[in-house]
Amino acid sequence: MSSHGKPTASPTVSCAKIDIFIMPNLATWIREKDEKWFQPFFDKHPDIRICGARKGAVALEEMDGLLLTGGSDISPEFLRQEVVDPSVLDKDVDLARDRWEFEAIAKILTRGRPILAICKGLQVFNVALGGTLKLDIKGHNLSEQKDHDVQPLRNDRAARHRFAQVNSSHHQAIDRLADGCEVEAWCATDDIIEQIRLRDYPFALAVQYHPERGKIYDALFDDFFSRVREFAKSLNRSIAQ
């Protein structure tokens, strides 16, 4: 209202909208002795924050992806089968890690975030979704098989990532495949499942072999990290400024 009693127009204020991009967060649990294998891939993607649950609490609701890595056998209490001979299982199971990983899978899946599971990670992923394991594979015991052992693969033609040979060292493997999963690769010599994916899900790939131990797997990691970025970007919000 002016001094003469007449209304005056309010000044026009324009609000520009800007996009806020938050650094992508990747949740994982990596044994100290395995960090050297993963660090080169992390260094190649410095824009992604690695949140290691072994070193401290991780807010899973803030994560944009999940990386499951190798380790000791799954604690028996999480297995969906009877353990007839407990002596075949590792004595150094990590109960705290298993609890975290099973919880992480459940929460990450409900939010559609990308998942890459490696070695034990594949086994945890399969069990978490309802599958079972071969608890001890003859000829695959760690005392019999070295980290540099190479296995030939049979690949499904539909698999996005296909390798003729892989570095695969393990004494357990998938027995009954979890519902909703598809096999993408088998060991050519004994039909052990080496690679699976979750159907009707943006990106959930699990491999029995060790892609962290070779440059030939760069494309697999690049694909995974790009999915983590894309998911984080999809959550961006415009705010008035």
Describe each PLM feature range:
Residues 204-209:
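Active-site-proximal beta-strand elements of phosphoester/diester hydrolases
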Residues 1-120, 126-134, 138-159, 163-165, ...:
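N-terminal beta1-alpha1 cap of cysteine-dependent amidohydrolase-like domains
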